[in-house]
């Protein structure tokens, strides 16, 4: 009787640059319970001294996103679970026109699970809580604001006390 050689089990590599990735347990919960009535979206804003230039804010957003590759995703609904899929598009800055913290659903095509908007002198960063927590969103919003101010002032800007 021939003995079968057992093949060693291959470990599944978790590559950050993969086309999709699983949500952590908290993100699974937020994705499952979120909807129009319970958005699970929160906002961080930066208030400036001058009116926001939308074109420069768009350039700052495109410049910021490569520093936060985990944010370059879209939320998708699979057969059994939600997951993040790599999003190759660039997000678009929009003028704030509706109520803040609106639902960001997985059924909206190529949308990102965050939104960057402006109103007057204010830059808004709204994010689905399944993507990041307050600290991650604060880092993103701070870096976005830094890039924006660098483009406006045409010189490097360092946020004071950036230990968060």
Spell out what each predicted region is.
Residues 1-164:
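Non-catalytic N-terminal regions of enzymes
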